[in-house]
Amino acid sequence: MPIYQLIDELVFPPLDHAEPGGLLAVGGDLSPRRLLLAYSMGIFPWFNADDPILWWSPDPRCVLALSAFYLNRSLSKELRRGRYEVTFDKAFSEVIRACARTPRKEGPGTWITGDMLKAYELLHGLGYAHSVEAWYEGCLVGGLYGVALGGCFFGESMFHCMPNASKVAFATLVRHLAMLGYHLIDCQQSSRHLLSMGATEVPRAEFLQLLQNAGVHPSTLPPKGKFPSR
């Protein structure tokens, strides 16, 4: 299938036009309206520094239904230990930059480019992008960030520089999102770690239905998801 070249108009091609690997379109921009439209349609940007902007909608999609979250014994013990203080939206810029510095298994470099940093910091300022932080003795040692729309949290990246710090941040986020009535977390691509916590791969069509059930519909101004504050 052809790869669509985006133009200035805020539109994306039908998702079933994506390549088998999930690549749907190239180009466009990282403006808030385009990013929000993309997320609300089940699309996300992911590209290297030397690439044009690439837009993806993989099939299958890795998701975590909050009711299916599995807290294993070691992580439960870590949470009870209370070694880390977890906060929300206290250090968004620091978290996304720490994620950008985290080495990738695929090789050197980062997909969180300078343009991506600016785009998500702008989304954060608009109340759509959020961070979760794990602190140890006043130092940021782990965390994650993503986008909250309706009853879905779209996870983007996480980091840690102490054992289990990002896992504690994630588990704490799951608990608070469940209390706020969220339905699911979009994990985008599966990993053994995510699957061990209850995430599963679902067909793209099922994922889109889950988004609708969570109150997320295609829009350049979708409803903001409520987010914990502490």
From Swiss-Prot:
Annotated InterPro entries: Acyl_CoA_acyltransferase, Leu/Phe-tRNA_Trfase, Leu/Phe-tRNA_Trfase_C, Leu/Phe-tRNA_Trfase_N
EC number(s) on file: 2.3.2.6
CC annotations in GO: cytoplasm
Gene3D superfamilies: Leucyl/phenylalanyl-tRNA-protein transferase, C-terminal domain, Leucyl/phenylalanyl-tRNA-protein transferase, N-terminal domain
Gene Ontology molecular-function annotations: leucyl-tRNA--protein transferase activity
Protein family membership: Belongs to the L/F-transferase family.
Any single biological process term in GO: protein catabolic process
Catalytic reaction(s) noted: N-terminal L-lysyl-[protein] + L-leucyl-tRNA(Leu) = N-terminal L-leucyl-L-lysyl-[protein] + tRNA(Leu) + H(+); N-terminal L-arginyl-[protein] + L-leucyl-tRNA(Leu) = N-terminal L-leucyl-L-arginyl-[protein] + tRNA(Leu) + H(+); L-phenylalanyl-tRNA(Phe) + an N-terminal L-alpha-aminoacyl-[protein] = an N-terminal L-phenylalanyl-L-alpha-aminoacyl-[protein] + tRNA(Phe)
Gene name of the record: aat
Keyword Ligase among record annotations: no
Function: Functions in the N-end rule pathway of protein degradation where it conjugates Leu, Phe and, less efficiently, Met from aminoacyl-tRNAs to the N-termini of proteins containing an N-terminal arginine or lysine.
Listed name of the protein: Leucyl/phenylalanyl-tRNA--protein transferase
